């Protein structure tokens, strides 16, 4: 079930504050976050986020096509190891 339209998109307040401050300062260093559930807003475009995948931080550069998606979609949490050929 998707989120109700009247509630609007979710973003952590501390993350939005960091992005706004970063845009004012014109600095482009990665913003470290554990908030995989936050929706990408248009203000995020052009910034780099270090998104936690449970073990390490994955750098995600936000483009226009990513607006409306979640940060966690671009930081995979599982690594597939190929099945062995000889059995």
From Swiss-Prot:
One GO-annotated biological process of the protein: translation
Keyword Ribonucleoprotein among record annotations: yes
Annotated GO CC locations: cytoplasm; small ribosomal subunit
Keyword Ribonucleoprotein annotated: yes
MF (Gene Ontology): rRNA binding; structural constituent of ribosome
Highest taxon, organism lineage: Bacteria
Gene3D superfamilies: 30s Ribosomal Protein S19, Chain A
Keywords: Ribonucleoprotein, Ribosomal protein, RNA-binding, rRNA-binding
Function statement: Protein S19 forms a complex with S13 that binds strongly to the 16S ribosomal RNA.
NCBIfam families linked to this entry: rpsS_bact
Family membership noted in the UniProt record: Belongs to the universal ribosomal protein uS19 family.
HAMAP family, sorted: Ribosomal_uS19
Protein name: Small ribosomal subunit protein uS19
Source species of the chain: Mycoplasma pneumoniae (strain ATCC 29342 / M129 / Subtype 1)
Gene from which this protein is expressed: rpsS
């Amino acid at each position: 079930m998707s989120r109700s339209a009247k509630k609007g998109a979710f973003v952590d307040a501390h993350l939005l504050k960091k992005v706004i401050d970063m845009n004012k300062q014109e600095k482009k260093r990665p913003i470290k976050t554990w908030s995989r559930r936050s929706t990408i807003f248009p203000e995020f475009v052009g910034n780099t986020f270090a998104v936690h995948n449970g073990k390490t931080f994955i750098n995600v550069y936000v483009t226009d096509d990513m607006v409306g998606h979640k940060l966690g979609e671009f930081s995979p949490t599982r690594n597939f190891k190929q099945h062995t050929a000889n059995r």
